């Protein structure tokens, strides 16, 4: 019985590349000369450092621009509060969302059940497994989910025949 998983996770290699490109641009830009502006990447977390709130927003703009060029959806980013550190410097922790949340997985299952397509959807941890008798049904479910679920970037993986 064919099946696939609906997941919500960023390509971490592309995130790392986007952070490196953003840091490279920040280090060469004229308006950041002499400032300690940078973006650090650790596991599922990014930390943006800057001299003040304005420069922090500029750092985030550069990061978002580089992520968009690397085809990383910015809806994966969850911005924390801005913290003041030594002197006038500020930092902001940006966490990278991973996995389908409980509410979103329930919404996905409800959309699939309401569509009356002959597939079964089950929540499995941070993914939703969709299985059905025909591959065409699964492809129509994928198209429907791409159209109906806009609050999170969905990926489909773990295809089985």
Curated annotation (Swiss-Prot):
GO terms for cellular component: cytosol. It comes from the Bacteria. GO terms for molecular function: nucleotide binding. CDD domains: YajQ_like. Gene3D superfamilies: 3.30.70.860, YajQ-like, domain 2 (3.30.70.990). Keywords: Nucleotide-binding. Pfam families: DUF520. Nucleotide-binding protein. Belongs to the YajQ family. This is Nucleotide-binding protein H16_A3060. It comes from Cupriavidus necator (strain ATCC 17699 / DSM 428 / KCTC 22496 / NCIMB 10442 / H16 / Stanier 337) (Ralstonia eutropha). The lineage of its organism: Bacteria, Pseudomonadati, Pseudomonadota, Betaproteobacteria, Burkholderiales.
């Amino acid at each position: 019985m064919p099946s696939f998983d609906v997941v919500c996770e960023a390509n971490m290699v592309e995130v790392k590349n986007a952070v490196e490109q953003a840091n490279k641009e920040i280090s060469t830009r004229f308006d950041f000369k002499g400032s300690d502006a940078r973006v650090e990447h650790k596991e599922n977390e990014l930390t943006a450092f800057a001299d003040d709130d304005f420069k922090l927003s500029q750092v985030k703009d550069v990061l978002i621009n580089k992520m968009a060029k690397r085809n990383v959806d910015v809806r994966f980013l969850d911005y924390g509060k801005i913290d003041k550190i030594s002197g006038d410097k500020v930092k902001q922790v940006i966490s990278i969302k991973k996995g389908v949340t409980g509410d979103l997985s329930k919404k996905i299952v409800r959309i699939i059940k309401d569509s009356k397509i002959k597939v079964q959807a089950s929540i499995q941890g941070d993914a939703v497994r969709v299985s059905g008798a025909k591959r065409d049904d699964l492809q129509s479910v994928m198209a429907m989910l791409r159209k109906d679920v806009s609050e999170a970037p969905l990926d489909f993986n773990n295809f089985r025949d």
